[in-house]
Amino acid sequence: MELNKLTAQEVAEMIQDGDDIGLSGFTPAGVPKMVPHAISEKALREHEAGRPFKINVYTGASTGQSCDGDLTNAQAIHFRAPYTTNKDFRRHVNADELEYQDMNLSNMATQLRQGNLGNVDWAIIEVSDIDIIGDKAQLYLTAAVGISPTVCRMAKKGIFLEYNLHHAGKMRGIHDVYEVEYHPYRTPINMTGPMDRIGKPYIEIPVDKIRGVVECNIADEARSFTAPSDTTDQIGQNVANFLLDNLRNGLIPKTFLNIQSGVGSTANAVLGAMGNCEEIPNFGIYTEVLQNSAVELLLSGRVTGASACSLTITDAELQKIYANIEFFKKHLILRPSEISNNPEVIARIGVCAMNTAIEADIYGHVNSTKICGTKMMNGIGGSADFTNNAYLSIFSCGSTTKEGKISSIVPFCSHIDHTSHFVDAVITEYGVADLRGIGDME
C-alpha cells in the first residue's frame, strides 16, 4: 500500500486552531522536527492576518528548538505538558504567556487516557521504518519512545509520520513497546530486571489512521551541557565513594543496584566516576535518559545492560551505537515513559536514584523545579518517579550557584518537590549528608 506523501507545510495546513497535538520523542531525541516548525510558520501567518491560532501540545518530556522553541516564539501554544528544557519556552512561561502543567513523566500517558487533558486530535511521530502488513502498519521509532504508543492509539483525526532517513533501517530491535491497561483493569508489569522485554519492537496501528508521511534527513537537536568542572568531578567522586562505602557496609547488595541517573554534566560526572571505581561491580542501568557516558560504559562492559526511554546523546555517540547495533540490541532497550519511569518496576528491581537539585534544605527537602520558589526552570521530570520508589535516593548539586553568590543549601527550600521522607542523601563537592536513620535536629 502506498502511503500519502506530504510536505511539512501541507500537514501544517491541516492543523487547526485549538487542536490537541501528541508528539513522539523524549528530550530532543525522537521528536518530529519538520512539522512543528511548519506549524510555527503557519501560526505567524495566521496571527499576521488577525486570526487566532494556538494548539495544545502533549509530549513525553522536553523537545528541541524546532518544536518548543519555534512554537513558543510564534505564540502558537496555548497549553503544554509535561516538561521542557527550552530557554525560549521558559521565558514565555515565566511571563505568563502560555499555560504549562508540570507533572511526573510516568503519569503523562495515563493522564491522556483518562481524558484529564482533553482529547488527542493528531499524533505526529518520527519513525525510522514503516512496515505495512495487510490493514496494519508497524512503526519503528527512532532515538526515543515517550508517549508515542498512547497518542497513536488515541489520535481522533489521524497520524502524521516524519520518516527520518537519518535513522532509516538502523533502529529495529532496540525498542520494547508496551502500553499499560486502563484502570481498574491493569495487570502487573511482568518485569524483574532492566533487560526484560515485555512488548513489541514497533507500534502497531490501523494503516488507515496514517494521514500522511513527511520525509526528512535531520539529526536530533542534541542538547549541549555545561562542560565538566572541578565541582562536578568532585561531586561525582563523592557519589562513587558514598556508594562504595554502602557496598562495603552491606547497606546495598553485593551484586549492586540498577542505576538511574538524571540529565546534565553532574550526571555524566557521576557515571564516569562510578565506571572508574574498580571496587564497584559491573552494574545495570534503569533510567529515563541515557547520556554519552552511558554509551561508553556499555561498550566497555562496565554497564551490563541499559533500559531507558531516550538516547539524549550527541550524533557522534549515536553513530557508535549504529556501528555496533548488533551489540546494542542485546544490551540496550528503549521503552515508553510510562514503563521506563514506572513506580511499580522501579520499586521491584532495586534502583539507586541519582538526581540534581536546585536547592536542598537542612531538613532534607529538595527543590528541583522553581528558582526562588516562583520561576519555573524545567520541571520535575522523572525525578519523583524514581526518588519516591528507589532503594536509595540521592540528590546532588554544587554547594553554591551564580558564581558562588547564592547557596544551594538553605534553611528551608523556597519550593518543595521532594520532601525529606523520600530523600536519603544530599551530596555536594564538599561531602555527603546521609539522612537515613536520623531526626530533624541531627
What are these regions (language model features)?
Residues 1-442:
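Conserved alpha/beta enzyme-core scaffold
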